Amino acid sequence: VLSPVSGPSETPVLGTEVESASVVPTLAVLHLADLFRNPKMRVPANRDWAKIGAYLRGDWPLPIPPRLIVGPERGYEALWGGQMAGLVERAVGAEFVALDTEYAPQTRLLHTIGVGWDSGGVVEGLQVLQTPHLSHVGRDRLTDILHAIMTQVPVVYQNAVGADLPVLEQAFGLRYADHKRVDDLMLAHAELWREWPHDLGFLASMYGVYPKMKHLAKQDPALYNWGDVLDTICAWQGVVKEMAQDPPVRQLYEEALQLIPILLESHKRGLRVAKSRVEPAIVEYQERLETALRLAWSYAGWKINLGEAQLKEQLYTREEF
């Protein structure tokens, strides 16, 4: 079933439930003929088609679980409430917690943090919004809460090295060494299925049991973040089961995990370079780039920007390559 989605043309996300203009629930999946072109997508396609039966039975998607939302509307007072103490107690008693951050990509300034867990089939969590508005006391309190959780229970991140761990250290001073254990969902899935995408949207299509929320980044940022937390929980539970059936892959994953602190430290230090060799090379290659640009302008007849989509337009639209 292909969805007649209105608006800008985009590649449909596998397993996305959307609504057309006539308000008909539609499940967007790969066309079966596409498997002749891309056979490696057979398993994801099978899982998507299997959702039809679950949908008709009312088993999918499941209702979105509740979470405690803490924000500036009430001065973040819930950080000190009795409900928070109960949440932390249940979090540290879970098998693992999933943690997801939302931040400004250029500055890594954190603005939303979500933590969720599955306690015997009951999924719940905590969300703190607009963290830059926290007072010093509130920030210290949130730091203590996060520290209490991560020192007592394994934490699963979607992308520990490339996103969440550096953001948490910048915002709260919480480091890799403060964790009981760090698990990386993207890394684990890459060990299992190297030929597939490893982004959270794809993983939600493969393992998710809740409505898609990846499209809510601007409409409802809080629900978008909570959706990432829920999808991380579901995907990690699925990946753990798959690794249990393939012990060599589990061993490879455990070995790869040992690189996380090394990579974090190397990202801080950067690369050591021989300036005496690099600086002259920069001048040489800059001259080559300028020459190439002038040649492109002369050939195209206009000041084409080789670093943007204009090159694609020139080659495929005008030259018809």
PLM feature segments, named:
Residues 1-66:
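Glycine/proline-rich loop-helix segments at beta-alpha junctions forming the active-site rim
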Residues 26-29, 96, 123-128, 155, ...:
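Conserved beta-strand scaffold positions in the cores of enzyme catalytic domains, especially
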Residues 106, 113, 161-175, 186, ...:
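Short active-site loop/helix that positions an aromatic residue
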Residues 33-38, 127-140, 180-225, 230:
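Short alpha-helix plus adjacent loop in nuclease-associated cores
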Residues 51-131, 220, 225-321:
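Conserved "right-hand" nucleotidyltransferase catalytic core of DNA-directed polymerases
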Residues 120-156:
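Nucleic-acid-processing active sites and adjacent nucleic-acid-binding tracks
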Residues 1, 98, 153-164:
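Acidic beta-strand-to-loop metal/phosphate-binding motif
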Residues 30, 99, 158, 183, ...:
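Active-site flanking residues adjacent to catalytic metal/cofactor-binding acidic residues
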